[in-house]
């Protein structure tokens, strides 16, 4: 029997906020996955740009081999999404409405694209995307399946949900946002049969050093 694959990538997620002993974010679900799974502490991004770095993740090739950039998707390069589909997998995605992701997932079985470019309308996990993902998982996807999700919640400038914007969830707004993401990871895991599903979590790249912790002027899609 082929395993299902739940593949979640976070834009601008720093490794030290996940497994460093000095992290201040609260991440019981990430800690569980690290404890029960495999954690790669020396995985290094091939680029600081989303399209280039994820192009490498999806093809196991360097950017100068893929020809994939954030603004120029090379459809002639095979990704493992295509390979898995050829092997009978049903392909699902929840991605931002950016050209790179739309072209990447154009031939998926089903795809949900959320607003990102118009920042004043941008919905994040707490603004509806999280519930949409849970609803899709609750529908019991046709097996075997791979469900790819890319989340922009950590991409600056980001909105911290009010219930997580507290010191107990981290010293900085970034740390608190990671705590919020972990909460949603827990909700997703509740809908997944871990006995027959491979769960993969990654970032595209890290973030600025120091972190660009600038609070947006508006916060319409938050609670």
Where are these regions (language model features)?
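Catalytic domains that recognize anionic headgroups
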Residues: 1-223
């Amino acid at each position: 029997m082929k395993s299902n694959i739940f593949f979640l990538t976070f834009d601008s997620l720093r490794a030290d906020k996940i497994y460093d002993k000095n992290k201040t974010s609260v991440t019981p679900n990430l800690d569980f996955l690290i404890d029960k799974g495999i954690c790669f502490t020396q995985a290094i991004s091939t680029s600081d740009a989303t399209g280039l770095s994820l192009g490498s993740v999806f093809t196991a090739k360097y950017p100068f081999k893929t020809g994939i950039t954030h603004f120029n998707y090379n459809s002639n390069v095979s990704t493992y999404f295509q390979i898995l589909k050829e092997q009978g997998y049903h392909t699902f995605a929840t991605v931002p409405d950016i050209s790179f992701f739309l072209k990447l997932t154009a031939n998926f079985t089903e795809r949900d694209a959320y607003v990102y470019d118009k920042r004043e309308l941008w919905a994040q996990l707490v603004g509806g995307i999280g519930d949409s993902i849970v609803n899709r998982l609750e529908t019991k996807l046709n097996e075997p399946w791979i469900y790819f999700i890319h989340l922009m919640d950590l991409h600056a400038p980001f909105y911290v949900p009010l219930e997580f914007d507290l010191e107990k969830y981290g010293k900085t707004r970034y740390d608190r946002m990671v705590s919020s993401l972990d909460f949603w990871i827990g909700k997703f895991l509740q809908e997944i049969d871990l006995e027959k599903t491979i769960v993969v979590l990654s970032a595209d790249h890290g973030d600025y050093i120091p972190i660009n912790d600038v609070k947006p002027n508006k916060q319409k899609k938050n609670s």
